[in-house]
């Protein structure tokens, strides 16, 4: 684990990191999020019966748009020229009464650049989850968004990171 916060200067003030001297490398990051819901809500999504429209298509586009706007949402993020943004959604019915029905969201962002795309991947997964909540809140308000996390990142000075299985 790094022991220095890169966005804090010697005076303790928040600053945008200067990446101008860094070499361009291919960088990629994957993130995930889950939306837990009632079986009836998941069935509305899967069957395409949600009155607001195609939940997965809307969440996918929202996640892609969010990744592209991360620099506008997170104050010290750099505007990036993303070469790839992918958002995948999977309906996961509960296997037994001890589990919940859920949607798993996985995002992937990629570029050739001077800074990483972890925040873009996390933002894509988060906003896709929020969009699912928004589109389904009329039928269920107690859905839970959980486990928003970075799964893997490659490229850059810190190298390869992957969550242990």
Swiss-Prot record:
Enzyme class per UniProt: lyase
Example GO BP: Mo-molybdopterin cofactor biosynthetic process
Top-level taxon of origin: Bacteria
Gene3D superfamilies reported for this sequence: Molybdopterin cofactor biosynthesis C (MoaC) domain
Residues the entry annotates as binding substrate: 76-78, 119-120
Catalytic activities: (8S)-3',8-cyclo-7,8-dihydroguanosine 5'-triphosphate = cyclic pyranopterin phosphate + diphosphate
Keywords, comma-separated and alphabetical: Lyase, Molybdenum cofactor biosynthesis
Active site: residue positions: 134
Annotated InterPro entries: MoaC, MoaC_bact/euk, MoaC_sf, MoCo_biosynth_MoaA/MoaC, Mopterin_CF_biosynth-C_dom
GO molecular function, one term: GTP 3',8'-cyclase activity
Keyword Lyase appears in the UniProt entry: yes
EC number: 4.6.1.17
Pathway: Cofactor biosynthesis; molybdopterin biosynthesis
Biological role: Catalyzes the conversion of (8S)-3',8-cyclo-7,8-dihydroguanosine 5'-triphosphate to cyclic pyranopterin monophosphate (cPMP).
Oligomer status and interactors: Homohexamer; trimer of dimers.
UniProt xrefs under PANTHER family: MOLYBDENUM COFACTOR BIOSYNTHESIS PROTEIN 1 (PTHR22960:SF0), MOLYBDOPTERIN COFACTOR SYNTHESIS PROTEIN A (PTHR22960)
Family: Belongs to the MoaC family.
Name of this chain's protein: Cyclic pyranopterin monophosphate synthase
Gene this chain is encoded by: moaC
């Amino acid at each position: 684990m790094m022991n220095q916060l890169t966005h804090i200067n010697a005076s303790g003030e928040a600053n945008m990191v200067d990446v101008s001297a860094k070499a361009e490398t291919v960088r990629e990051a994957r993130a995930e999020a889950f939306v837990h819901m009632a079986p009836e809500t998941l069935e509305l999504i899967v069957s395409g019966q949600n009155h607001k429209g195609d939940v997965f298509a809307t969440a996918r586009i929202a996640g892609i748009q969010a990744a592209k706007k991360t620099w506008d949402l997170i104050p010290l993020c750099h505007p990036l020229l993303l070469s790839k943004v992918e958002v995948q959604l999977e309906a996961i019915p509960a296997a037994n009464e001890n589990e919940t029905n859920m949607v798993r969201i996985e995002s992937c962002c990629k570029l050739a650049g001077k800074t990483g795309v972890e925040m873009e991947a996390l933002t894509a997964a988060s906003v896709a989850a929020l969009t699912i909540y928004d589109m389904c809140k009329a039928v269920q308000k107690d859905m839970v968004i959980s486990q928003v996390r970075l799964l893997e990142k490659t490229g850059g000075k810190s190298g390869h990171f992957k969550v242990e299985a």
